[in-house]
Amino acid sequence: MGKVWSKSSLVGWPQVIDRMRRQQDPAEGVGAVSQDLANRGAITIRNTKENNQALAWLEEQKEEAVGFPVCPQVPLRPMTYKEAFDLSFFLREKGGLEGLVWSTKRQEILDLWVYHTQGIFPDWQNYTPGPGVRYPLTFGWCFKLVPLSPEEVEEANQGDNNVLLHPMCQHGMEDPDKEVLVWRFDSSLARVHRARELHPEFYQNC
């Protein structure tokens, strides 16, 4: 039996076992491609740019100038609870996201940056529907989207320095409920999966 597995057969095994130990399940709430990456180690033919919105969107980004390379610098992987948790606290510490007005383009830039630097497939940043507070579907991501009151929007729009195309000046045009949303950090989201409590139907196939 010892002849079958010689010393030469063990080349690379330390790296393999290290990868196995570091393997984590995807965070609850990630998309179908991330589930593929976690369960099968690759994107399968079940998910294509024809039937998966995230894949189609990512393909489009490769053809546009977004300010930094789109291809990931590290192996492609799904968002895990720990990754989402660590990213949340990293962004909170560095600043910039807290209180920033949400827009589709800004969310896409964040998704692409995480994809490029960490190799995390961009189907993890999704939120519960409105109106009202939108909670992250991915457990571990501690930023929710909070609507501003009409008074807060008007106050922010006062002055001569406002840019007409700034998300604040769009009065929620991108949001189905016409609300101006901002990212807000909420550490309780690391302990309580509010999205699953409010919308268990979103997790039936997870």
Curated annotation (Swiss-Prot):
- Report which superkingdom the organism of origin falls in: Viruses
Q: How does it sit in the membrane?
A: Lipid-anchor
Question: What is known about its induction?
Answer: Expressed early in the viral replication cycle.
The signal peptide annotation in the UniProt record is none
Q: Where is this region: SH3-binding?
A: 69-78
Question: A single GO CC term, please?
Answer: host cell plasma membrane
Keywords of this entry: AIDS, Apoptosis, Early protein, Host cell membrane, Host Golgi apparatus, Host membrane, Host-virus interaction, Inhibition of host adaptive immune response by virus, Inhibition of host autophagy by virus, Inhibition of host MHC class I molecule presentation by virus, Inhibition of host MHC class II molecule presentation by virus, Lipoprotein, Membrane, Myristate, Phosphoprotein, Secreted, SH3-binding, Viral immunoevasion, Virion, Virulence
Where in this protein would one find the motif PxxP, according to its record? 72-75
GO MF, one example:
GTP binding
What interactions and quaternary structure are annotated?
A: Monomer; cytosolic form. Homodimer; membrane bound form. Interacts with Nef associated p21-activated kinase (PAK2); this interaction activates PAK2. Associates with the Nef-MHC-I-AP1 complex; this complex is required for MHC-I internalization. Interacts (via C-terminus) with host PI3-kinase. Interacts with host PACS1; this interaction seems to be weak. Interacts with host PACS2. Interacts with host LCK and MAPK3; these interactions inhibit the kinase activity of the latter. Interacts with host ATP6V1H; this interaction may play a role in CD4 endocytosis.
Q: What is this protein called?
A: Protein Nef
